[in-house]
Amino acid sequence: KAERTCTSSSTDCCGEKGLNEQQQQCKMYCDLDGVLVDFDAGIQRVTGSKPHQLPPYILWAKVASTPDFFENLGWMADGKELWNSIKGMNPDILTGVPTAKKCRAQKAAWCERELGVPTSHVDMAGTKKAHEVVSGRRSKKEGVVNVITCWSRNKHCESRRGAVLIDDRLSLQQDWVARGGIFIHHTNTRKSLGELRRLGILPSI
């Protein structure tokens, strides 16, 4: 059965109180571009310009025309530190995709090669911008990272009480939190890890 676009507007939020008791129940999601993967450097490599210097239609056309663009991106300078700090919590990857369908498999291939753990790709970028299963199946096995590709605006469909998203796009925070989740606005690894520890999601050092 397809998982349709969510419509919940629940504000039941998992706050700081009691988080330590629920630590094992927290579900971690981590974005790729701008968090683990250096998307900006990739764009600059193939265009000679920074992403914000390009009109969106030119940027995405270049991404679509560059063979294996997402698969060949490098890590953010502090991306491996972040991943190594959270991978013990059995996180899933939650990453937005452009309209070119081949980009979905490219992102999954990057994760399979780079994350150092078994992965399972689940494509949720459905027709008419729906959040529904297009291909793949979520693994429930411990230690397997589900790589969930979806439309960015639908990331909140994965949110619920205890769901933690690390993402660099602040515009996604409101909808994620409205469904009960915890949003970590990523600007760098040091700050994100500090916030996770402050909330009791990661142990203090």
Q: What do these predicted ranges mean?
A:
Residues A105-P118, D175-R179:
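Short, aromatic/basic amphipathic alpha-helical patches
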Residues P55, V63-I93, A100-A105, A109:
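Short, acidic loop-to-helix structural element flanking the phosphoryl-transfer center
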Residues I93-T95, L165:
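Structural beta-sheet core signal
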Residues R160-R198:
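Acidic, Mg2+-coordinating phosphoryl-transfer loop and its flanking beta/alpha structural elements
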Residues V122-T127, E132-V133, R137-S171:
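Conserved Lys-Pro-Asp/Glu-containing loop-to-beta segment of HAD-superfamily phosphomonoesterases
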Residues C14, G18-P67, A178:
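Active-site neighborhood of HAD-like aspartate-dependent phosphohydrolases
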Residues V37-F39, R45, P91, A100-R104, ...:
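Short catalytic/ligand-binding loop motif for oxyanion handling, primarily in non-cytosolic enzymes
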